[in-house]
């Protein structure tokens, strides 16, 4: 198959990187092209070894299409066509070398402005290219919106990464299958690690600007992480790996992690993990005895290597993945919106940490079958390409 991937962020978000890597590992020997938002950054993390990287956007001259979109913006305030114009040349160039186009930004329907993804879906359709919404999570109330439901039905296939989204999309009448997030399929890559991983138990911690942005009580998320670190230092002998998973300039996990590191006077039990590729981060996380994470794909790196994990989440993806892995999300996901008192994350940690051996055994038993479900999506894509 000739597969084009689009709608994804660049690899400085290592979740975006992990989706591409996991997709290639799942689907195997095909021709891959990525319509990249930042070819240089994607190449920096090695994605050019897996796929041809093509700029997703091109500067548009002021042709009729530009003038029409500009008029629509000025008259109606609708900027979707104006934004979408810059993607059209790359999409039109895909016609001769694409069997399937995968929209791989799994969170794209979580953050508003879904109209641009409907625009891109239609743009591929005009080139007679079948589209697949790949590894997605969408809040059921968003799926229920008529415009979203209509858009979802225009995909040849929707591959939902958890059951909450699957049921909502199925009810909307779209062609849908349920698969694990493609990042579950990405293999870790061994790398050099801090020597403290060899000398002591290590608990991994990830915090993100995103959960701080989504908190309802200002300062609650950071205060809870700070209290958790203090608890671990007072009540265990474990070292703590402060682990970034997104390093974009405007959304950089290293900023709150470095603040935590400094707030504890760079205590020798704290490991400030540097930036790595997604497979290397997965390897580092796999060496933790327990993981507390905010970034979805940091927690997937933990889950998929059998590491007991507490998720500080804010959306359907965290709830749905935990429900599919454990049968429920309560106790496994702490919604950041609910944080009020500074000890809530610590209490949730204590509850899971006490059960860590049983959780690890459960993950090790069920993960092979869970990940194997992804094979259904591979077969579905092959059938679409042949149809």
Residue locations for each model-derived region?
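Active-site anion-handling motifs in enzyme catalytic cores
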Residues: 1-387
């Amino acid at each position: 198959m000739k597969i084009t991937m689009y709608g994804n962020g660049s690899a400085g978000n290592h979740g975006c990187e992990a989706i591409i890597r996991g997709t290639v590992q799942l689907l195997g020997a095909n021709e891959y092209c990525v319509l990249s938002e930042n070819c240089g950054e994607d190449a920096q993390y090695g994605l050019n070894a897996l796929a041809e990287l093509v700029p997703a956007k091109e500067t548009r001259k002021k042709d009729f299409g530009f003038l029409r979109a500009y008029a629509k913006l000025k008259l109606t305030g609708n900027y979707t066509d104006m934004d979408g114009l810059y993607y059209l040349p790359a999409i039109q160039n895909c016609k001769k070398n694409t069997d399937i186009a995968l929209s791989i930004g799994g969170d794209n329907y979580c953050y508003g402005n879904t109209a641009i993804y409907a625009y891109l879906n239609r743009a591929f359709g005009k080139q007679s290219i079948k589209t697949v919404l790949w590894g997605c999570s969408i809040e059921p109330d968003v799926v229920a919106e008529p415009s979203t439901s209509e858009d979802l039905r225009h995909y040849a296939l929707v591959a939902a990464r958890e059951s909450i989204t699957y049921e909502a999309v199925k009810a909307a009448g779209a062609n849908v299958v349920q698969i694990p997030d493609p990042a579950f399929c990405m293999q870790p890559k061994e790398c050099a690690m801090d020597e403290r991983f060899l000398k002591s138990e290590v608990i991994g911690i990830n915090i993100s600007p995103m959960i701080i942005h989504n908190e309802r009580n200002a300062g609650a998320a950071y205060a809870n992480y700070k209290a958790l670190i203090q608890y671990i230092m007072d009540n265990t002998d474990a070292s703590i790996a402060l682990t970034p998973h997104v390093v974009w300039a405007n959304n950089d996990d290293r900023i709150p992690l470095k603040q935590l590191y400094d707030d504890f006077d760079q205590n020798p039990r704290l490991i400030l993990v540097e930036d790595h590729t997604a497979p290397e981060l997965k390897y580092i996380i796999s060496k933790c005895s327990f993981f507390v994470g905010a970034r979805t794909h940091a927690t997937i790196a933990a889950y998929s290597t059998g590491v007991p994990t507490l998720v500080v989440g804010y959306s359907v993806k965290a709830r749905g993945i935990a429900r599919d892995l454990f049968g429920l999300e309560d106790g496994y996901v702490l919604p950041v919106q609910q944080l009020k008192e500074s000890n809530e994350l610590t209490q949730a940690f204590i509850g899971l940490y006490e059960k860590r051996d049983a959780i690890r055994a459960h993950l090790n038993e069920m993960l092979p079958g869970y990940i194997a479900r992804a094979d259904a999506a591979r077969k579905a894509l092959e059938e679409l390409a042949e149809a």
